[in-house]
């Protein structure tokens, strides 16, 4: 389980600090698929970097903490990352938590065969076992995830984009971590390959019983595979709840507009997009940051920021219209 406690994060720039995350507060439960959605530039990938504790300059934690609890050899362990303990969660990388980065098919080392890259991962985290043991385990695991064994002898450029993506996912899940983060795992892949990647992630999560966190701007991806989801806008979480409930009755005006923009089978009409774009985080508007684009905005929306509160059992949102 992971608990995100009122996290704010900023980017250091030559003109000053830019607050990229503002007071994000939620939890990721054991054995669930959790989605993080929103337009480009809303802070999804930045949030994932904070959760995975890969905050390198110019990104740094401004406030709050991230707590990770996981099982290790039958013992429940707890790690914390905050301003006093930077890098606290990094000790659990790959063993307890793993990360499939955006454009993952491009992260493989082009001058090493796939088997050598698996071995490097294995050597760093299973030092007591040799290369022969690694080969045996990798071959068995490739069979489990539906990858042919001959990919081990291949260089990355010899594989298709979809196959490279599968290899990276296989590496990220090879040590059976308790939590997996996937940042836009279907980007730049055709629709057929996208379906295969999502199916692979779902099957691995069901088999391992771990938590899977999916970041995607594609609401259709979240509808297909997530149990719960959070909607990000301008660095803040504006809605959170069970995925089925969010799609059936979205609470926040931004979520409503996102869902209305989705195409439907048999629909011959034009879909309605969301006018404008996310605000410049260097100079965000006062009050609710969505107010300039919201057709239901009231004067109070531009005067004070709404609090992220539980509106219904298990459902949270940040909107003045819901707090009346």
Language-model features, listed with the residues they occupy:
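The feature captures the beta-strand-to-loop junction immediately N-terminal to the Walker
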Residues: 37-39
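Short catalytic/signature loops enriched in Gly
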Residues: 75-79, 242-324
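Conserved ABC ATPase "signature" region
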Residues: 132-150, 259
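P-loop NTP-binding/switch modules centered on Walker-like glycine-rich loops
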Residues: 185, 189-269
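A short, proline-enriched helix->beta-strand linker immediately N-terminal to the Walker B motif
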Residues: 174-178
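Conserved ABC ATPase signature
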Residues: 155-159, 163
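A short, flexible loop at the N-terminus of ABC-type nucleotide-binding domains that lies
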Residues: 1, 10-23, 54-59, 72-76, ...
């Amino acid at each position: 389980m992971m608990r995100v406690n009122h996290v704010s994060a900023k980017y250091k720039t030559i003109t000053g600090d830019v607050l990229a995350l503002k007071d994000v507060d939620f939890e990721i439960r054991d054995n669930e698929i959790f989605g993080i959605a929103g337009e480009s530039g809303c802070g999804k990938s930045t949030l994932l970097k904070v959760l995975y504790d890969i905050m390198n300059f110019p990104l740094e934690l401004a406030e709050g903490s991230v707590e990770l609890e996981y099982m290790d050899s039958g013992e429940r362990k707890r790690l914390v990352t905050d301003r006093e303990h930077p890098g606290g969660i990094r000790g659990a990388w790959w063993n307890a938590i793993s990360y499939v980065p955006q454009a993952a098919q491009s992260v493989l080392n082009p001058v090493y065969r796939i088997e050598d890259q698996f071995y490097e991962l294995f050597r760093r985290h299973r030092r007591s076992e040799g290369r022969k043991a690694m080969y045996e385990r990798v071959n068995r695991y490739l069979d489990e995830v539906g990858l042919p064994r001959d990919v081990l002898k291949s260089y990355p450029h010899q594989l298709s984009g979809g196959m490279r993506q599968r290899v990276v996912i296989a590496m990220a899940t090879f040590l059976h971590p308790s939590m997996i983060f996937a940042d836009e795992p279907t980007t730049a892949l055709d629709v057929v390959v996208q379906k295969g990647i999502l199916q692979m992630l779902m099957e691995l999560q069901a088999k391992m019983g771990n938590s899977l966190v999916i970041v995607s701007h594609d609401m259709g991806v979240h509808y297909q595979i997530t149990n719960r989801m959070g909607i990000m806008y301008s660095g803040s979480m504006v809605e959170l709840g069970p995925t089925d409930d969010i799609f059936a009755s979205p609470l926040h005006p931004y979520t409503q507009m996102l869902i209305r923009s989705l195409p439907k089978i048999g629909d011959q009409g034009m879909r309605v997009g969301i006018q404008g774009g996310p605000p410049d985080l260097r100079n965000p508007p006062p009050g609710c940051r969505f107010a300039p684009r919201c057709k239901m905005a009231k004067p109070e929306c531009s005067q004070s920021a709404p609090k992220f509160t539980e509106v219904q059992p298990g459902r949270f949102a940040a909107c003045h219209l819901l707090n009346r």
